[in-house]
Amino acid sequence: MTVTDIASRTYNHSWRLDPIIRSLLDTDFYKLLMLQMIREDYSNQQVTFSVINRSRHVRLAEIIDEGELRAQLDHARTIRFTKKELIWLAGNTFYGKTHMFSADFIRWLAEFRLPEYELRKVEGQYELHFHGPWTHTTMWEIPALAILNELRSRAAIKGRGRFELDVLYARAKAKLWTKVERLRKLENLRLSDFGTRRRHGFLWQRWCVEAVKEGLGPSFIGTSNVLLAMDNDLEAIGTNAHELPMVAAGLAKDDEELRWAPYRILDQWRQTYGGNLLIALPDAFGTKAFLRDAPEWVADWTGFRPDSAPPIQAGEEIIAWWEKKGRNPRDKLLVFSDAMDVGSIEETYHHFTGRVRLSFGWGTNLTNDFVGCAPDGSFNLDPISLVCKVSSVDGHPAVKLSDNPEKATGLPSEIERYLRVFGDVGRVRKPVLV
């Protein structure tokens, strides 16, 4: 394993274009899983993804040079899956299953390229949209966010001295290792890297993954980043995302179809995949609404990934639902991944251990925690909340309600309609930091 001196590489940066995205596998595993199903069942749907900066106080268009951003986006569009990558996808075992991806899908990937983008500046922010077939626009989400976050990081460290950069990265490494030492104390912990989309940079994410792999040993069960999984002989981790119910809801012709849209697309998911991939994401239109109306077969799924409610509150609610359905929570799995850090991982672990199977996805606070590390005390490396969500489906506006109204996306009039259909019970507003 070659260890890169990140500080030296940053300081010596002099080339015209240092590509942020170098592989189409530099994405989250669930994008490929969803893509295979999308291609089978939704190949004709036109879906727009839009970047949203929830941290409005950070004016990205005044920090990131537009020419540099366009150059990175343009470069990403030139990348194709390599023969080596396709052979690995076709032949590897994922979640205990061989041939997770069909031969026909692998052949289709060989010709895949990212579609065009639409970019403009508006009031200090970038408006970045990806229009086209869902089979193609979906693959922009992760690279677009990674590009924006890394360009912001590069702008923040530009002009810093060689030794200042040494100190910056030394402090960040020590900070991470302190977290690893705390996590080592949690017996039978199961933790994965979920930090691609909001990482400080690719090299930093790679360092973090390799460090946690060494530091936690078998407690580190894998990474959502497909490229890092391939390069580091790790499990690729991930199931499905909010875009599935958001698109299904956007296609609904009336309120009754809207109410059942999340379950209809999950039923398609279980027909495509099974076993350990049966993890439901319940909060797209509110967890309480999801559990209230869920068909009986949802209780037979492997587990849930609570994503926007406070973790202990969400976990207790799901456990109570399982018990009401006559299922034993000890046989089920909860995957906690919303802004988790060492403190919330410890608290959630101690609260639920022995009552339910647990797994944790560690994202931004693993791969982009430079808070307090800058020698000059600046805050411009602190992480921001940047997302890329479905904004329209076949010309109809898309909506995400979330358990936290601060995370809701969509037109106000459409949000009101969705609240009328799904209800507003159990949604609690809290600040969104990452």
Curated annotation (Swiss-Prot):
One of its GO terms (biological process) is NAD biosynthetic process via the salvage pathway. The modification Phosphohistidine is found at H242. InterPro entries: N/Namide_PRibTrfase, NAPRTase_N, Nic_PRibTrfase, Nic_PRibTrfase-Fam, Nicotinate_pribotase-like_C. Its EC number is 6.3.4.21. Keywords: Ligase, Phosphoprotein, Pyridine nucleotide biosynthesis. The keyword Ubl conjugation does not apply. PANTHER family: NICOTINATE PHOSPHORIBOSYLTRANSFERASE. HAMAP family: NAPRTase. This is Nicotinate phosphoribosyltransferase.
